[in-house]
Amino acid sequence: THLDHTSAAAQRDQVAVINRVMRERYAEASKPVFLGGDLNALPDSGTLRALQEAWTVLTPTDGGTYPSHDPKKCIDYILQLDNGVTCETAGARVLHRFEAGDAARASDHLPVLLEIRLPAES
């Protein structure tokens, strides 16, 4: 997911569609539903608050993800739809280096990693 980076009004419209469509399609899902990406929204922004009406942020918000060479802003996230399905977060972090090398050279955003334990099949 990539939200608009220039207009708060456009972000509001995008979030309204995401929340509505995902709730309609996955409210009765038996598995967790995730949303991840460059949301171009700071942790205390209206955009993230609007997303949190339907989603729970699972990745850290206290460190930067952008720009990758000097990450000062957290604008990249992984969220879980609040549809009654739970999963355990086993770990979540921003990656600065990984096996392929320096993350700052791969993108202008640092990757976020989420490790989960899925609920047992019933």
Sequence positions of predicted segments:
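Catalytic metal-binding/acid-base residues of hydrolase active sites
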Residues: 2-4, 39-42
